[in-house]
A protein has these predicted regions:
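Short gly/ser-rich loop at a beta-strand->alpha-helix junction or flexible surface loop bordering the NTP-binding
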Residues: 1-186
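Surface segments flanking catalytic/ligand-binding clefts of nucleic-acid enzymes
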Residues: 2-20, 24-28, 163-271
Length: 271
């Protein structure tokens, strides 16, 4: 193996162990990396950041975003990530369409120009926290910023997950929003949506389905209800949605996300 190949292998191995992209301040190394990019062996997710093509293709979109964020944090340790970038760190359900540039918090007096890679947002009255080794806006602020910029279905998915993750009450969130940014764009939308939030919802897909029910005027179902098994009443199973009619009969609704078909653990050996 050539010396350059050994150097590249070690560079990528160190980065991958840290779940980051490879970077280098050495111009000679960067030239070698660019040649690998031209040959299709290496990808450049962001300016100055590199990853092996085979490794990168095996990552999910959120994992790719976290790699870029960790790399950016190593270069700019004072950065605080916000909006969808912070949401990914918390594990909030975010549409992949919104995972492009990284979002960084700033102040009015220190605002920078947006670029293809970085979007800057003025964030006031918030204490940053460390999540997955990354400096991010607080959970409440992150939830608020995400909810106010997306449609009702996506906002409800974020709201449901936030209640499940943080264990708080919707009313507390609304009070917090009024204090920190009640006049910001989309604040009223975020507060209205939070009134429908339910921590019992177990996936973003279930939340989006429930949002459609609300928008179309359907009666709201009970969520995650345990019912006895017909052939073994000592055991039970849970349904995603349950409606009870006036005559006492019941209607069951299920939301099947792709994970149920792709995750062997969820299939339990079934095809």
């Amino acid at each position: 193996m050539k010396a350059n190949d050994v150097e590249m292998a070690q560079l990528f191995l160190r980065a991958e162990r840290m779940r980051m992209c490879a970077i280098s301040s050495c111009e000679r190394t960067r030239k070698i990396l660019r040649r690998h990019v031209e040959r299709g062996e290496v990808v450049r997710p962001a300016r100055g950041m590199y990853a092996r093509a085979a490794y990168w293709s095996g990552l999910s979109k959120p994992e790719k975003m976290l790699h870029v964020m960790r790399t950016a944090q190593s270069i700019h340790p004072d950065w605080v990530f916000c909006h969808e970038s912070a949401a990914v760190a918390f594990g909030l359900p975010v549409s992949y369409e919104r995972l492009g540039a990284i979002h960084v918090a700033t102040t009015r007096s220190n605002r920078n120009a947006n670029s293809k890679t970085v979007r800057w947002h003025v964030v006031a009255e918030d204490e940053s926290v460390i999540v997955q080794g990354l400096r991010v806006t607080s959970l409440q602020r992150t939830v608020f910023d995400c909810m106010r910029m997306v449609d009702f279905g996506q906002a409800l998915a974020v709201a449901d997950f936030a209640l499940r993750l943080g264990g708080g009450r919707a009313s507390a969130f609304v009070s917090h929003v009024r204090r920190i940014g009640g006049n910001l764009e989309g604040a009223a939308h975020a507060m209205r949506t939070m009134h429908y939030a339910d921590a019992r919802s177990e996936s973003g897909g279930e939340s989006i389905a429930r949002a459609a029910m609300i928008q179309h005027g359907f009666a709201l179902p009970e969520l995650q209800v345990a019912l006895p098994r017909p052939l073994d009443r000592r055991r039970s199973y849970r349904v995603d949605f349950l409606w009870t009619r006036l005559d006492g009969s019941r209607v069951i609704g299920e939301f099947d996300g792709m994970q149920k078909y792709e995750d062997a653990a969820l299939r339990g050996g079934r095809t």
